[in-house]
């Protein structure tokens, strides 16, 4: 301890010696370089891994500055004027009423009739929305009308409800029964009805789409293809029910129903343009420079912002599910909140807007992937690469779903590695453009040619170009300049034909 105190007391005297300063510099360099080498060798990372393995996961660290993160959207408020939809199992599907209601509509496949046909009247047509006799709840009429319209007009193009009857008793609520075995001159209506319902719901239901060809490969893997609307159930029952969180809500069913004839559409509509993107803080004040999602739009984390570079990619390319979702959020923020319309007008407006905001090709592509039992996008969770230093993000990509659960990060490892590399490239290009804009071209030229001059001078110095002649066996003749014959014009060297040689400067 005394030696340490003595060392600190003698620091001023030590620094005065140049040799001591050199030793201190060498010691610091060795310590720093040794620490860097120790970190690069991997022993520290191994110790950290052994301590935290199986106990903690801070996220997917791609490299020293890039990290794989995700954002999950809450779409319930966006579609608060539309019925919420979900499936409990192969036979029960539910539609919840708009926001602020506690009722719902239950769709059930069964082999047992719920009522005697003598107590029910036939539904002739929906051409004029004539279902008032079937709705005794005075609250679900519009939702029921919208549901039946979508099932029959927009998907099936069927104006007559073959085999459909409803209960008309007062205070009986809603009870509509379809006989799926009844046919018509145009084909089996029940089969088309099940096909359209499965298309809207979008779930892979063996009981709803059961007539398929089972294609098996050589390795034993089998896949159902060319599925048609078919079910072994005889009746489809539509009735009112209370909403008791029967199942988890998914926005895809609502989006599919709002998109008119999406399954048969082969030409994509022209998408509506974006609004002006800007950042809004937690209090709602707008700050130019990017786009922030409000708290209601996220499942977790209070607020999430994306910079202008991400939004610019959406404005340029309309081929990402994330861009579709951002259009819906932006429309909901700037249009729906300013409207004072009743439920029916709001639904019609939102349907028309969704048709111009959502890309047909993306929805069709994901629907086909879901039917083919390969990973697809459900428009709720997106992953992106975050630069922890500059806080820049890559364009979020959809986190694909398979068998009702999200894929593990390792399943799309190549994708986020490519996004990380692209983020690096974008950063380098941006820094280069900024540097070019701040540096005068003349100064850049001077710097370049001075570097060329320095490089040439170093090369010439290494080559060793001779500068004057010497007479062999004698000293340097300077300041005399000897000719190739060994003579000097002043007469000091006057004996001709002596051997001479070229010598570099200083020799």
From Swiss-Prot:
List where the protein spans the membrane.
Answer: 18-32, 34-53, 446-466
InterPro entries per record? Arena_glycoprot (IPR001535), Arena_glycoprot_zinc-bd (IPR043015)
Domain of life of the organism encoding this protein: Viruses
The residues exposed to the Cytoplasmic compartment are: 33, 467-507
Q: Name one GO biological process term.
A: virion attachment to host cell
UniProt keyword list: Disulfide bond, Fusion of virus membrane with host endosomal membrane, Fusion of virus membrane with host membrane, Glycoprotein, Host cell membrane, Host endoplasmic reticulum, Host Golgi apparatus, Host membrane, Host-virus interaction, Lipoprotein, Membrane, Metal-binding, Myristate, Transmembrane, Transmembrane helix, Viral attachment to host cell, Viral envelope protein, Viral penetration into host cytoplasm, Virion, Virus endocytosis by host, Virus entry into host cell, Zinc
Q: List the disulfide bonds.
A: 86-247, 292-305, 314-323, 377-398
Marked site, Important for GP-C-mediated membrane fusion, at: 33
Question: Molecular function terms in GO for this entry?
Answer: metal ion binding
Q: Name one Pfam family in it.
A: Arena_glycoprot
Q: Where does Zn(2+) 2 bind?
A: 468, 470, 476
Q: Has the keyword Manganese been applied to this entry?
A: no
Q: Which residues lie on this side of the membrane: Extracellular?
A: 2-17, 54-58, 59-445
Give the family per the record.
Belongs to the arenaviridae GPC protein family.
| Domain notes from UniProt | The cytoplasmic domain of GP2 plays a role in ER location. It also contains a zinc-binding domain that allows SSP retention in the GPC complex by accepting a cysteine from SSP as the fourth ligand.
Protein name, as recorded? Pre-glycoprotein polyprotein GP complex
Q: Tell me the organism.
A: Parana mammarenavirus (isolate Rat/Paraguay/12056/1965)
Q: Which gene encodes it?
A: GPC
């Amino acid at each position: 301890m005394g030696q340490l105190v003595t060392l600190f007391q003698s620091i001023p005297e030590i620094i005065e010696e140049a040799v001591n300063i050199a030793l201190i510099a060498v010691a610091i360099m060795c310590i720093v370089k040794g620490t860097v080498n120790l970190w690069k060798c991997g022993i520290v990372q191994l110790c950290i891994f052994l301590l935290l393995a199986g106990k903690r996961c801070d996220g997917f660290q791609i490299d020293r500055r890039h990290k794989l993160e995700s954002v999950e959207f809450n779409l319930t408020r966006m579609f608060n004027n539309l019925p919420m939809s979900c499936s409990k199992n192969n036979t029960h599907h539910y539609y919840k009423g708009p926001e602020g209601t506690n009722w719902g509509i239950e769709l059930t496949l069964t082999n047992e009739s719920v009522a005697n046909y003598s107590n029910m009247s036939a539904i002739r047509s929906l051409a004029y929305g004539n279902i008032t006799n079937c709705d005794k709840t005075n609250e679900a009429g519009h939702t029921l009308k919208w549901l039946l319209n979508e099932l029959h007009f927009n998907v099936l193009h069927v104006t007559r409800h073959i085999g459909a009857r409803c209960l008309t008793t007062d205070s009986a609520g809603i009870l509509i029964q379809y006989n799926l075995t009844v046919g018509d001159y145009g084909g089996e209506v029940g089969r088309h009805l099940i096909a359209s319902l499965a298309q809207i719901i979008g779930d892979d239901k063996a009981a709803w789409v059961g007539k398929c060809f089972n294609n098996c490969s050589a390795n034993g893997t089998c896949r159902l293809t060319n599925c048609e609307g078919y079910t072994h159930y005889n009746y489809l029952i539509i009735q009112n029910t209370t909403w008791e969180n029967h199942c988890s809500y998914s926005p895809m069913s609502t989006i599919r129903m709002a998109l008119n004839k999406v399954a048969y559409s082969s030409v994509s509509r022209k998408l509506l343009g974006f609004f002006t993107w800007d950042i809004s803080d937690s209090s709602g004040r707008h700050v130019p420079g990017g786009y922030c999602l409000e708290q209601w739009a996220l499942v977790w984390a209070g607020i999430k912002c994306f910079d202008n570079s991400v939004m610019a990619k959406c404005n340029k390319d309309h081929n990402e599910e994330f861009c579709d979702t951002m259009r819906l959020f932006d429309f909901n923020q700037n249009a729906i909140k300013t409207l004072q319309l009743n439920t029916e007008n709001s639904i019609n407006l939102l349907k028309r807007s969704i048709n111009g905001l959502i890309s047909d090709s993306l929805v069709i592509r994901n629907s086909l992937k879901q039917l083919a039992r390969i990973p697809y996008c459900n428009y709720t969770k997106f992953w992106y690469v975050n630069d922890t230093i500059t806080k820049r993000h890559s364009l979020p990509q959809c986190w694909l779903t398979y068998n009702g659960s999200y894929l593990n990060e390792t399943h799309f490892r190549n994708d986020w590695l490519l996004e990380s590399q692209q983020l690096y490239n974008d950063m380098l290009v941006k820094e280069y453009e900024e540097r070019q804009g701040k540096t005068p071209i003349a100064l850049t030229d001077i710097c370049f040619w001075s570097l060329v001059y320095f490089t040439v001078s170093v090369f010439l110095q290494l080559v060793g170009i001779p500068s004057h002649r010497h007479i062999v066996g004698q000293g340097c003749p300077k300041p005399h300049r000897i000719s190739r014959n060994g003579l000097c014009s002043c007469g000091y060297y006057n004996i001709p034909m002596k051997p001479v040689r070229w010598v570099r400067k200083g020799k």
